[in-house]
Protein backbone atom coordinates (compact mmCIF):
# COMPACT_ATOMS: atom_id res chain seq x y z
CA UNK A 1 0.00 0.00 0.00
CA UNK A 2 1.10 3.57 -0.68
CA UNK A 3 0.64 6.62 1.51
CA UNK A 4 0.62 10.37 0.96
CA UNK A 5 2.10 12.22 3.93
CA UNK A 6 1.23 15.91 4.19
CA UNK A 7 4.35 17.84 5.17
CA UNK A 8 4.02 21.06 3.17
CA UNK A 9 2.80 23.45 5.87
CA UNK A 10 4.77 26.35 7.32
CA UNK A 11 4.63 25.02 10.89
CA UNK A 12 3.56 28.40 12.24
CA UNK A 13 2.38 26.98 15.57
CA UNK A 14 5.92 25.77 16.27
CA UNK A 15 7.75 28.97 15.45
CA UNK A 16 10.50 30.00 16.13
CA UNK A 17 11.69 26.37 15.83
CA UNK A 18 10.34 26.21 12.28
CA UNK A 19 11.67 29.52 10.99
CA UNK A 20 14.37 27.69 9.04
CA UNK A 21 13.10 24.11 8.66
CA UNK A 22 9.80 22.21 8.31
CA UNK A 23 8.33 20.93 11.54
CA UNK A 24 8.56 17.31 10.34
CA UNK A 25 12.35 17.74 10.29
CA UNK A 26 12.41 18.83 13.93
CA UNK A 27 13.93 16.17 16.19
CA UNK A 28 11.76 13.93 18.31
CA UNK A 29 14.19 12.30 20.72
CA UNK A 30 17.05 11.17 18.48
CA UNK A 31 15.55 11.40 14.99
CA UNK A 32 13.38 13.72 12.89
CA UNK A 33 9.62 13.62 13.34
CA UNK A 34 9.15 12.34 9.78
CA UNK A 35 11.13 9.20 10.62
CA UNK A 36 8.66 8.33 13.38
CA UNK A 37 5.82 8.72 10.87
CA UNK A 38 7.55 6.74 8.11
CA UNK A 39 8.63 4.02 10.54
CA UNK A 40 5.06 3.59 11.77
CA UNK A 41 3.76 3.39 8.21
CA UNK A 42 6.39 0.83 7.24
CA UNK A 43 5.56 -1.31 10.26
CA UNK A 44 1.93 -1.27 9.09
CA UNK A 45 2.65 -2.55 5.59
CA UNK A 46 3.21 0.68 3.66
CA UNK A 47 6.00 0.21 1.12
CA UNK A 48 6.07 3.67 -0.44
CA UNK A 49 5.51 7.14 1.00
CA UNK A 50 4.77 10.16 -1.17
CA UNK A 51 5.79 13.33 0.65
CA UNK A 52 3.56 16.26 -0.28
CA UNK A 53 6.05 19.11 0.03
CA UNK A 54 5.73 22.87 0.06
CA UNK A 55 7.75 24.76 2.66
CA UNK A 56 11.51 24.19 2.33
CA UNK A 57 11.30 20.93 0.36
CA UNK A 58 15.10 20.73 0.13
CA UNK A 59 15.21 19.87 3.84
CA UNK A 60 13.69 16.48 2.96
CA UNK A 61 15.42 15.82 -0.34
CA UNK A 62 18.85 16.61 1.13
CA UNK A 63 18.23 14.52 4.27
CA UNK A 64 17.08 11.48 2.26
CA UNK A 65 18.92 11.66 -1.08
CA UNK A 66 18.65 7.91 -1.63
CA UNK A 67 14.85 8.01 -1.37
CA UNK A 68 14.66 6.01 1.85
CA UNK A 69 13.30 7.14 5.20
CA UNK A 70 13.15 4.72 8.15
CA UNK A 71 13.44 1.88 5.64
CA UNK A 72 10.48 3.03 3.54
CA UNK A 73 10.77 4.24 -0.05
CA UNK A 74 10.13 7.94 -0.64
CA UNK A 75 8.81 9.90 -3.57
CA UNK A 76 8.49 13.67 -3.62
CA UNK A 77 5.66 15.89 -4.86
CA UNK A 78 6.50 19.59 -4.50
CA UNK A 79 3.48 21.88 -4.74
CA UNK A 80 4.18 25.05 -6.74
CA UNK A 81 1.72 26.90 -4.49
CA UNK A 82 -0.14 25.90 -1.32
CA UNK A 83 -3.68 24.72 -2.10
CA UNK A 84 -4.74 23.52 1.39
CA UNK A 85 -5.12 19.91 2.51
CA UNK A 86 -7.25 18.55 -0.32
CA UNK A 87 -5.28 20.47 -2.92
CA UNK A 88 -2.07 18.93 -1.60
CA UNK A 89 -3.61 15.45 -1.73
CA UNK A 90 -4.80 15.98 -5.30
CA UNK A 91 -1.41 17.25 -6.45
CA UNK A 92 0.55 14.42 -4.83
CA UNK A 93 -1.88 11.71 -5.95
CA UNK A 94 -1.78 12.85 -9.55
CA UNK A 95 2.00 13.25 -9.50
CA UNK A 96 2.49 9.53 -8.81
CA UNK A 97 -0.66 8.10 -10.43
CA UNK A 98 -2.63 7.27 -7.30
CA UNK A 99 -5.72 8.78 -8.91
CA UNK A 100 -5.52 6.09 -11.62
CA UNK A 101 -4.72 3.15 -9.35
CA UNK A 102 -7.03 0.20 -8.77
CA UNK A 103 -6.68 0.21 -4.98
CA UNK A 104 -7.11 2.71 -2.15
CA UNK A 105 -4.25 4.72 -0.69
CA UNK A 106 -3.52 6.27 2.68
CA UNK A 107 -3.26 9.92 3.60
CA UNK A 108 -1.55 10.92 6.84
CA UNK A 109 -0.91 14.25 8.50
CA UNK A 110 2.84 14.50 8.91
CA UNK A 111 2.77 15.88 12.46
CA UNK A 112 0.81 12.99 14.00
CA UNK A 113 2.68 10.42 16.07
CA UNK A 114 0.57 7.34 16.72
CA UNK A 115 0.57 3.56 16.95
CA UNK A 116 -2.80 3.17 15.22
CA UNK A 117 -3.24 -0.22 13.53
CA UNK A 118 -3.77 0.73 9.90
CA UNK A 119 -4.94 -2.78 9.02
CA UNK A 120 -8.12 -2.31 11.05
CA UNK A 121 -8.85 0.95 9.22
CA UNK A 122 -8.36 -0.68 5.82
CA UNK A 123 -10.48 -3.68 6.83
CA UNK A 124 -13.43 -1.45 7.79
CA UNK A 125 -13.01 0.51 4.56
CA UNK A 126 -13.29 -2.65 2.48
CA UNK A 127 -16.06 -4.22 4.56
CA UNK A 128 -18.30 -1.16 4.23
CA UNK A 129 -17.53 -0.48 0.58
CA UNK A 130 -16.58 3.03 1.64
CA UNK A 131 -15.21 5.72 -0.60
CA UNK A 132 -13.16 7.07 2.28
CA UNK A 133 -12.58 5.90 5.85
CA UNK A 134 -10.97 8.02 8.54
CA UNK A 135 -9.50 7.21 11.94
CA UNK A 136 -10.97 8.90 15.02
CA UNK A 137 -9.34 9.47 18.39
CA UNK A 138 -10.83 10.77 21.68
CA UNK A 139 -9.61 14.06 23.19
CA UNK A 140 -10.61 16.12 26.21
CA UNK A 141 -11.09 19.36 24.26
CA UNK A 142 -12.33 18.82 20.70
CA UNK A 143 -12.60 22.53 19.85
CA UNK A 144 -9.26 22.58 17.95
CA UNK A 145 -10.18 19.65 15.72
CA UNK A 146 -12.81 18.18 13.42
CA UNK A 147 -15.47 16.34 15.46
CA UNK A 148 -16.99 13.29 13.78
CA UNK A 149 -20.20 11.65 15.08
CA UNK A 150 -20.88 8.24 13.52
CA UNK A 151 -23.71 5.71 13.30
CA UNK A 152 -23.66 2.09 14.52
CA UNK A 153 -22.12 0.84 11.27
CA UNK A 154 -19.38 3.49 11.29
CA UNK A 155 -21.00 5.72 8.70
CA UNK A 156 -20.12 9.34 9.37
CA UNK A 157 -23.20 11.41 10.20
CA UNK A 158 -21.54 14.83 10.25
CA UNK A 159 -18.13 16.44 9.97
CA UNK A 160 -17.92 19.46 12.22
CA UNK A 161 -14.65 21.37 11.96
CA UNK A 162 -13.48 23.05 15.21
CA UNK A 163 -16.79 23.41 17.07
CA UNK A 164 -17.24 25.32 20.32
CA UNK A 165 -16.32 23.00 23.16
CA UNK A 166 -19.75 23.36 24.77
CA UNK A 167 -21.55 22.48 21.53
CA UNK A 168 -19.38 19.60 20.33
CA UNK A 169 -21.57 16.50 19.78
CA UNK A 170 -18.77 14.15 20.90
CA UNK A 171 -15.09 14.12 21.78
CA UNK A 172 -14.12 11.82 18.89
CA UNK A 173 -12.04 13.80 16.44
CA UNK A 174 -10.45 13.39 13.05
CA UNK A 175 -7.08 11.72 13.75
CA UNK A 176 -5.49 12.76 10.46
CA UNK A 177 -5.25 9.26 8.97
CA UNK A 178 -7.43 8.37 5.97
CA UNK A 179 -8.00 5.54 3.53
CA UNK A 180 -9.14 7.04 0.22
CA UNK A 181 -10.37 5.48 -2.98
CA UNK A 182 -8.88 7.04 -6.13
CA UNK A 183 -12.33 8.50 -6.89
CA UNK A 184 -11.86 10.97 -4.03
CA UNK A 185 -9.21 12.78 -6.07
CA UNK A 186 -11.82 13.63 -8.71
CA UNK A 187 -13.92 15.35 -6.03
CA UNK A 188 -11.19 17.93 -5.42
CA UNK A 189 -11.55 21.03 -7.58
CA UNK A 190 -8.59 22.23 -9.64
CA UNK A 191 -7.00 25.64 -9.48
CA UNK A 192 -8.02 26.80 -6.02
CA UNK A 193 -7.52 26.06 -2.34
CA UNK A 194 -9.64 23.13 -1.15
CA UNK A 195 -9.85 21.80 2.42
CA UNK A 196 -10.59 18.10 2.73
CA UNK A 197 -11.98 18.69 6.22
CA UNK A 198 -14.26 21.62 5.40
CA UNK A 199 -15.32 20.81 1.84
CA UNK A 200 -14.61 17.28 0.61
CA UNK A 201 -15.53 15.26 3.69
CA UNK A 202 -18.84 17.12 4.31
CA UNK A 203 -19.81 16.44 0.67
CA UNK A 204 -19.07 12.76 1.18
CA UNK A 205 -21.17 12.74 4.35
CA UNK A 206 -24.07 14.02 2.27
CA UNK A 207 -23.49 11.17 -0.21
CA UNK A 208 -23.22 8.56 2.56
CA UNK A 209 -19.80 7.34 1.39
CA UNK A 210 -17.63 8.40 4.36
CA UNK A 211 -16.96 5.98 7.23
CA UNK A 212 -14.85 6.17 10.37
CA UNK A 213 -13.14 3.90 12.88
CA UNK A 214 -12.89 4.90 16.54
CA UNK A 215 -9.50 4.01 18.01
CA UNK A 216 -7.98 4.30 21.48
CA UNK A 217 -4.45 3.93 20.08
CA UNK A 218 -1.80 6.34 21.31
CA UNK A 219 -2.10 9.56 19.31
CA UNK A 220 -0.49 12.99 19.48
CA UNK A 221 -0.74 15.97 17.17
CA UNK A 222 2.86 17.13 17.69
CA UNK A 223 2.34 20.45 15.92
CA UNK A 224 2.19 22.79 18.92
CA UNK A 225 4.85 23.64 21.52
CA UNK A 226 2.85 21.91 24.27
CA UNK A 227 2.37 18.68 22.32
CA UNK A 228 5.85 18.72 20.76
CA UNK A 229 7.21 18.85 24.30
CA UNK A 230 4.82 16.33 25.84
CA UNK A 231 5.22 13.68 23.13
CA UNK A 232 8.98 13.63 23.62
CA UNK A 233 8.75 13.36 27.39
CA UNK A 234 6.19 10.56 27.03
CA UNK A 235 8.23 8.67 24.42
CA UNK A 236 11.38 8.99 26.52
CA UNK A 237 9.54 7.59 29.54
CA UNK A 238 7.82 4.81 27.60
CA UNK A 239 10.88 3.63 25.69
CA UNK A 240 13.51 4.16 28.38
CA UNK A 241 15.38 6.54 26.09
CA UNK A 242 18.56 8.02 27.53
CA UNK A 243 20.68 10.91 26.21
CA UNK A 244 24.13 10.27 24.77
CA UNK A 245 27.08 12.59 24.35
CA UNK A 246 25.95 15.15 26.93
CA UNK A 247 27.97 16.85 29.68
CA UNK A 248 26.06 17.43 32.92
CA UNK A 249 27.83 18.93 35.93
CA UNK A 250 27.49 16.73 39.04
CA UNK A 251 25.79 19.58 40.90
CA UNK A 252 23.18 20.14 38.17
CA UNK A 253 19.66 18.71 38.29
CA UNK A 254 18.14 17.09 35.20
CA UNK A 255 14.68 15.57 35.66
CA UNK A 256 12.17 14.32 33.06
CA UNK A 257 14.06 16.10 30.31
CA UNK A 258 15.25 15.30 26.80
CA UNK A 259 18.81 16.45 26.15
CA UNK A 260 20.12 16.07 22.61
CA UNK A 261 23.68 15.14 21.73
CA UNK A 262 26.29 17.75 22.62
CA UNK A 263 24.24 19.53 25.30
CA UNK A 264 26.17 20.96 28.23
CA UNK A 265 24.54 21.68 31.61
CA UNK A 266 26.58 23.79 34.03
CA UNK A 267 27.04 23.77 37.80
CA UNK A 268 23.85 24.18 39.81
CA UNK A 269 21.67 24.44 36.72
CA UNK A 270 18.22 22.84 36.62
CA UNK A 271 16.57 21.32 33.55
CA UNK A 272 13.17 19.86 34.29
CA UNK A 273 10.27 18.83 32.05
CA UNK A 274 11.99 20.34 29.03
CA UNK A 275 13.57 19.56 25.66
CA UNK A 276 17.01 20.93 24.81
CA UNK A 277 18.45 20.75 21.29
CA UNK A 278 21.87 19.68 20.06
CA UNK A 279 24.99 21.59 21.13
CA UNK A 280 23.06 23.94 23.41
CA UNK A 281 24.76 25.24 26.55
CA UNK A 282 22.85 25.69 29.81
CA UNK A 283 25.18 27.81 31.92
CA UNK A 284 25.72 27.66 35.68
CA UNK A 285 22.67 28.32 37.83
CA UNK A 286 20.25 28.61 34.92
CA UNK A 287 16.78 27.05 35.19
CA UNK A 288 14.90 25.57 32.23
CA UNK A 289 11.45 24.42 33.34
CA UNK A 290 8.65 23.14 31.07
CA UNK A 291 10.21 24.79 28.03
CA UNK A 292 11.87 24.06 24.68
CA UNK A 293 15.33 25.22 23.61
CA UNK A 294 16.50 24.76 20.03
CA UNK A 295 19.92 23.81 18.71
CA UNK A 296 23.16 25.71 19.31
CA UNK A 297 21.60 28.08 21.84
CA UNK A 298 23.08 29.48 25.04
CA UNK A 299 20.99 29.92 28.18
CA UNK A 300 23.00 32.37 30.24
CA UNK A 301 24.09 31.91 33.84
CA UNK A 302 21.31 32.42 36.36
CA UNK A 303 18.62 32.92 33.73
CA UNK A 304 15.19 31.28 34.00
CA UNK A 305 12.98 29.85 31.24
CA UNK A 306 9.56 28.60 32.26
CA UNK A 307 5.87 28.60 31.35
CA UNK A 308 6.46 26.83 28.02
CA UNK A 309 8.95 29.32 26.68
CA UNK A 310 10.39 28.42 23.26
CA UNK A 311 13.91 29.49 22.32
CA UNK A 312 14.99 29.11 18.71
CA UNK A 313 18.22 27.82 17.21
CA UNK A 314 21.46 29.73 17.93
CA UNK A 315 19.78 32.19 20.29
CA UNK A 316 21.74 33.59 23.24
CA UNK A 317 19.75 34.30 26.40
CA UNK A 318 21.56 36.87 28.50
CA UNK A 319 22.62 35.94 32.04
CA UNK A 320 19.99 36.62 34.68
CA UNK A 321 17.10 37.04 32.26
CA UNK A 322 13.67 35.55 33.09
CA UNK A 323 11.47 34.33 30.24
CA UNK A 324 7.95 33.19 31.09
CA UNK A 325 5.83 31.79 28.24
CA UNK A 326 7.92 33.72 25.70
CA UNK A 327 9.03 32.96 22.15
CA UNK A 328 12.59 34.02 21.28
CA UNK A 329 13.06 35.29 18.67
CA UNK A 330 9.50 36.54 18.42
CA UNK A 331 8.08 35.07 15.16
CA UNK A 332 5.90 38.17 14.79
CA UNK A 333 9.05 40.25 14.47
Regions found by a protein language model. Give the residues of each.
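A structural signal for short hydrophobic beta-strand segments in well-ordered beta-sheet cores
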Residues: 25, 147-150, 201, 212
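Generic preference for hydrophobic
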Residues: 25, 76-77, 159, 212
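Structural signal for interior beta-strand "rungs" in well-ordered beta-sheet cores
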Residues: 242-333
Amino acid sequence: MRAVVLVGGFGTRLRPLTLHRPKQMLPVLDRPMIEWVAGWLGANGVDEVVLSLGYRPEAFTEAYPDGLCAGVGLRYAVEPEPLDTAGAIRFAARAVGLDQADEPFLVVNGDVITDLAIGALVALHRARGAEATIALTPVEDPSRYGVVPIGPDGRVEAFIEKPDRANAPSNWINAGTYVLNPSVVARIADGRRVSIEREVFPAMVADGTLYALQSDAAWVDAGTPATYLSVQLELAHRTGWRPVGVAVDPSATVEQAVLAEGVSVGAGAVVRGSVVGRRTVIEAGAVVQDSIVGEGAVVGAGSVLDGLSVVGDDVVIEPGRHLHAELVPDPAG
